[in-house]
Amino acid sequence: MKKVTAMLFSMAVGLNAGSAAAKAKASEEQETDVLLIGGGIMSATLGTYLRELEPEWSMTMVERLDSVAQESSNGWNNAGTGHSALMELNYTPQNADGSISIEKAVAINEAFQISRQFWAHQVERGVLRTPRSFINTVPHMSFVWGEDNVNFLRARYAALQQSSLFRGMRYSEDHEQIKEWAPLVMEGRDPQQKVAATRTEIGTDVNYGEITRQLIASLQKKSNFSLQLSSEVRALKRNGDKSWTVTIADLKNGTVHNIRAKFVFIGAGGAALKLLQESGIPEAKDYAGFPVGGQFLVSENPDVVNHHLAKVYGKASVGAPPMSVPHIDTRVLDGKRVVLFGPFATFSTKFLKNGSLWDLMSSTTTSNVLPMMHVGLDNFDLVKYLISQVMLSEDDRFAALKEYYPQAKKEDWRLWQAGQRVQIIKRDADKGGVLRLGTEVVSDQQGTIAALLGASPGASTAAPIMLNLLEKVFGDRVSSPQWQATLKAIVPSYGSKLNGNVAATERELQYTSEVLGLKYDKPQAADSTPKAQLKPQPARKEVADIAL
């Protein structure tokens, strides 16, 4: 009996000692040069840049979920488009005089070329493997009907021929030609309907989740990189030496520990705004966010999937904001082809698909509530659009699909809830608050913390966005000969523009296509098309893209 009692006592002491040791370990402060908050494509891309630029720097990545790339980067939570403005009509607005503005389209395309170069470089280094697992050639098409829309697309096509980035685009108003390009879109359509389409063969479908997983897997091979899953940031505090102490909660065992970091990047998607506010930096006070979700109709029926190989983008209906642009897309997800149609906007107060219903309320402060109200009043068309989308029935969504796929059958499609996107609202001296397009890097004056806010065009421009972040927070290092040489090795066109330089454009497209296993044929002479007669239009307000 005494032996049993002694044994039980020893076990109890051992367990208590183990528990005490665990608590002591939890209270220890870990030190790291760079802390990456969020396990998505932005953090993975920044970490990959820094691994080449400063291989000795230690890095820690924390992710709230139990695996990386499960929120916006997940292939099922976005449209998987390699956004390069080849088909997205909202990137080429019509000016008041009737002309077509291509400046934004050129900027979007230039940005995507940087991403292609970044990925190609990582393939050559062995960081990314099997390019077909994350990027595939899928032609990009614009498709419209009705005389005014046809005139617009014709004028858009003509305007884009001024840029070397859009060489190789084809234009047609012929039913049979368009049917050859996109059978699903044309079969069963009224043969008298006036239609037009453009097609660019070098479009891409991209699985950003797969890219993220492969980049992080490569980072994990280094001993000075640490990945902490099921880990949630609870607090950020600036220290006297300009470093940051970040409090992390382990969601599995309930322990809490601190990480002391010289630089913090908040790449947490929709959660970035709340964490930026938690940091207390003055720059955060200018921002608010408004969440918009998206749904897609999905078909995995081989009869549908094998009959469509393109991403086909339409034009927003009259009175609808550009964010409502519908598209029917070939996707390659989980190793197989599917077809998606949408997006249909949804509303939730969550900032993440796996977020909290309190996200919107908890991010609203005395400094950003007025800008939010001003934006609501100034963008009433957007408010009406969101309300109408939330009210859509199953029949309404199917009717929208049939506009792009006249012979669609309900039984071939199911509804899928994609990710959440937080649109940026920024304080404005004149208007009180404005809805900001695109993404924005927000950092403190010392360059010790930075966050990425916004949604469009999202993951497809992760490489140029993180390049911009490097220039903003590591300006002195970026200008050094060492960093300059490394950055130009990663992105050969770094520091120059491809637009207007045919030889440079073709060289980079040929290089990235070969490495990434993509289709690329030297462009032929542009199609000759009749000149479009566009009527002058009242100037349009820019509206944020849903970025799905």
Swiss-Prot record:
Its cofactor is FAD. This is Probable malate:quinone oxidoreductase. It catalyses: (S)-malate + a quinone = a quinol + oxaloacetate. Residues 522-548 are annotated as: Disordered. Pathway: Carbohydrate metabolism; tricarboxylic acid cycle; oxaloacetate from (S)-malate (quinone route): step 1/1. It comes from Escherichia fergusonii (strain ATCC 35469 / DSM 13698 / CCUG 18766 / IAM 14443 / JCM 21226 / LMG 7866 / NBRC 102419 / NCTC 12128 / CDC 0568-73). GO terms for biological process: tricarboxylic acid cycle. InterPro entries: FAD/NAD-bd_sf, MQO. Keywords: FAD, Flavoprotein, Oxidoreductase, Tricarboxylic acid cycle. Belongs to the MQO family.
